[in-house]
C-alpha cells in the first residue's frame, strides 16, 4: 500500500494544467467573451439517451454540462459567454473517461456552426500548435445517414477510431442525431452539428443552436420514450429551460470541449490519469 495516497499525475502535469487554464481564459478575454459560473447541482438534468447523470438524494443532479443554464442566461440577455469547470457523468471511467472532468463550454451570439468551427480551430492551434483540419462529412465517414441510431453510433465510433493521426471536423450529422442542433437549412437530412477529433480522440461537440421550444420539447419526449423502452431512468423535463427557450434564445452557436483530453494531447499522455491528480481510482 506504500504510496497509495499519491496523486495520479506528475507535478509537471499540474503546472501544464494551470498554464492551459490561463491560456483558455486569455483566449476568451481577448475576444470579450464573458466567463460565468452556473450551478453544478440542479433540480433537472439532460434526457440524452447516451448520458447518465449522477443523482444526489433522489431530488437533485450533478450537472453533465452547463448547457441548459448557459442558454437560460443567453435568453435573459447575456452576451457571448463561456464556462470552465467540473461536470459529472455516471458510469464513465477508463483511459479517456472519468466521472468528474473539466469542461469548457461557450456560446457565440450571431455565429453559426461554420463560424464556430473556425474559432475552435484557432483555440486548438493556440494550444497544440498550428495544423490543418480536415472537414469530414458524416456520410463520408460512416457511409450512410440512415439506419438504427445505435448501429450508426457504433459505426461512427469504429470509423473515428480508424481515422488515425490528424485533426478532423466531422460535420453534417444525420437529423436523427441532431441532439440540440438545428437542422441544416439547405439540407434538412443533416444537422448543423460538428465534432472535433484529434488523433482519434473526440475533443469537442458543437451546434448551431436550436431555439424552437416546441421542437426541443418533442426531442426531449422522444429521448424519454427511448429511455423508458430500454429500461433507463427518465428525468422530468426541465420546464425552466423550455420556458427560457419559449422566451427566446438569440441566434447563436455553442460548443463543449474536453479540457482534460486537450491537456492529454498537449502533453503526449496516453490516459486522463496522467493529467488528473485524482481520477476515480484514487479520489
Regions found by a protein language model. Give the residues of each.
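Hydrophobic face of alpha-helices
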Residues: 21, 25, 117-124, 217, ...
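A translation/RNA-centric and nucleic-acid-associated enzymatic feature enriched
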Residues: 4, 23, 39-73, 82-109, ...
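A conserved active-site cap/scaffold subdomain adjacent to cofactor or substrate pockets
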Residues: 96-147
Amino acid at each position: 500500500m506504500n504510496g497509495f495516497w499519491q496523486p495520479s499525475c506528475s507535478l509537471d502535469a499540474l503546472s501544464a494544467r494551470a498554464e492551459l487554464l490561463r491560456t483558455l481564459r486569455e483566449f476568451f478575454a481577448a475576444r470579450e467573451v464573458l466567463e460565468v459560473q452556473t450551478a453544478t447541482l440542479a433540480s433537472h438534468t439532460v434526457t440524452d439517451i447516451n448520458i447518465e447523470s449522477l443523482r444526489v438524494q433522489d431530488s437533485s443532479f450533478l450537472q453533465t454540462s452547463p448547457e441548459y443554464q448557459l442558454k437560460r442566461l443567453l435568453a435573459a440577455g447575456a452576451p457571448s459567454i463561456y464556462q470552465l469547470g467540473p461536470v459529472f457523468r455516471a458510469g464513465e471511467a477508463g483511459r479517456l473517461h472519468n466521472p468528474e472532468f473539466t469542461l469548457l463550454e461557450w456560446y457565440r451570439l450571431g455565429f453559426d456552426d461554420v463560424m464556430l468551427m473556425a474559432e475552435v480551430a484557432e483555440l486548438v492551434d493556440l494550444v497544440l500548435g498550428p495544423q490543418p483540419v480536415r472537414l469530414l462529412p458524416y456520410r463520408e465517414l460512416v457511409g450512410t445517414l440512415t439506419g438504427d441510431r445505435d448501429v450508426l453510433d457504433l459505426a461512427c465510433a469504429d470509423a473515428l477510431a480508424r481515422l488515425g493521426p490528424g485533426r478532423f471536423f466531422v460535420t453534417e450529422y444525420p437529423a436523427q442525431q441532431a441532439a440540440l442542433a438545428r437542422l441544416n437549412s439547405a439540407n434538412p437530412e443533416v444537422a448543423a452539428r460538428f465534432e472535433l477529433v484529434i488523433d482519434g480522440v473526440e475533443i469537442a461537440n458543437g451546434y448551431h443552436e436550436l431555439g424552437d421550444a416546441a421542437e426541443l420539447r418533442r426531442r426531449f419526449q422522444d429521448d424519454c420514450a427511448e429511455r423508458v423502452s430500454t429500461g433507463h431512468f427518465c428525468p422530468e423535463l426541465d420546464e425552466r429551460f423550455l420556458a427560457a427557450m419559449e422566451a427566446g434564445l438569440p441566434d447563436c452557436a455553442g460548443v463543449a470541449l474536453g479540457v482534460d483530453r486537450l491537456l492529454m494531447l498537449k502533453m503526449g499522455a496516453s490516459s486522463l490519469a496522467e493529467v488528473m491528480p485524482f481520477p476515480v481510482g484514487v479520489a
